[in-house]
Amino acid sequence: MNKILLQCDNLCKRYQEGTVQTDVLHDVSFSIGEGEMMAIVGSSGSGKSTLLHLLGGLDTPTSGDVIFSGQPMSKLSSAAKAELRNQKLGFIYQFHHLLPDFTALENVAMPLLIGKKKPAEIDARAREMLHAVGLEHRATHRPSELSGGERQRVAIARALVNNPRLVLADEPTGNLDARNADSIFELLGELNRLQGTAFLVVTHDLQLAKRMSRQLEMRDGRLTAELSLMGAE
């Protein structure tokens, strides 16, 4: 079994507005190993996106903790969490969130700029990642000049440009047609093999989830089962 990379222990998340309390996550516990490909499957409103926000240090659990590479996130300062997100974690969303006034190359380079890498290293690595996703010929194009599938490929290149140990993906193919969705998941698998990056993908699509090596089901804020989707149709 792969060495544990990320572990969450009894995560709970509750929101309160006035006297109204809403429990979104209930005692969620699981782990993901180095280089593992995992899917969390659930319908809209099941708590999947909230879970990813907690795992990425973008929000704080009401109780429980997230442990990344042996280090509890509850012990990290805001600055340390930001550095962790820049250096060790990658994020892919249903919407690409590319900066519209920047080229594909500049968008991919952004995490390296934030990390204050040297200019020559930034350019070389950003071009390397565009090549990895098959878009080196679109380096100077802005998002408005790219197709939906191309924009998502640029977003994936940006998420992986710092060679993170784990990528958190929230419905990464939700805005794509079947052909482009299939292409994106093929790409994630290839990058996993080439870079050893672990992927945690949340999705409602069983056909996409079954491509991952492990699948968990989330329902009403609880992880209810480990799924076997080899025969999913």
Swiss-Prot record:
It comes from Salmonella typhimurium (strain LT2 / SGSC1412 / ATCC 700720). It is found in: Cell inner membrane. Its EC number is 7.6.2.-. Residues 6-233 form the ABC transporter domain. It is a peripheral membrane protein. GO terms for biological process: lipoprotein localization to outer membrane; protein localization to outer membrane; transmembrane transport. Belongs to the ABC transporter superfamily. Lipoprotein translocase (TC 3.A.1.125) family. The keyword Nucleotide-binding applies. ATP binds at residues 42-49. The complex is composed of two ATP-binding proteins (LolD) and two transmembrane proteins (LolC and LolE). It is an enzyme of class 7 (translocase). It comes from the Bacteria. This is Lipoprotein-releasing system ATP-binding protein LolD. PROSITE patterns: ABC_TRANSPORTER_1, ABC_TRANSPORTER_2, LOLD. The keyword 4Fe-4S does not apply. Part of the ABC transporter complex LolCDE involved in the translocation of mature outer membrane-directed lipoproteins, from the inner membrane to the periplasmic chaperone, LolA. Responsible for the formation of the LolA-lipoprotein complex in an ATP-dependent manner. GO terms for cellular component: plasma membrane.
